[in-house]
Amino acid sequence: YLMESLGMAVIALEIGALSSARAMITAKKEYISEARAILDIGATRSTLIIFDHDHIQFSSSLAYSGEMLTAAISQKLHISYDEAEMKKKTYGLKYQKSKNWAILTKLTDKLVEQIQKTLDFYYSHFQNSNKITHITMCGGGSALKNLDKILSLKLKISSKPGNAWKNLNSPKPIDFDEKKSLRFAKAIGLALRAADNPFFNNDTI
């Protein structure tokens, strides 16, 4: 009704997980006997996406976000939200014995637990599931210093921020900060869909 009232027609509807996967999963690579996970860490929530057998098998929301970490720093150190945001970006996750940073350690440990439970659920409830050999990170929170190292260490799975531009066939180099691009992974994935299925071909799939 809203679109009709604006004089617009819906061409396609797509869940965010599908858009993220289109950008973050290497299109030209064949994943044989292995699976991938995408960890999308946003401002208000995070999502873990399981990609196996050339398809998204399922996704799960996780209680972890950039705003959650910033608010925790602000409350713990009794500083403004903006100052806490600056400290978060500057220092990242200091995974060491620090009273001021202990709250971030606790929140990140809970994230690890949530990811592990999600992976265990996938292995036990999905037939012919392959082992997840890598976690590709995206979203604005994926640039948090040391987070990839902590996840790799705790989960014993290689974890690293991905490249949101890797599936774009462009003759010219992309002049955009790779880390900053990760916050636009969904938008880039949607753009890739449009590039693969031009609207003028009446392809509404």
What are these regions (language model features)?
Residues 1-205:
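Hydrophobic/aromatic-enriched cytosolic interaction surfaces used to assemble or bind macromolecules
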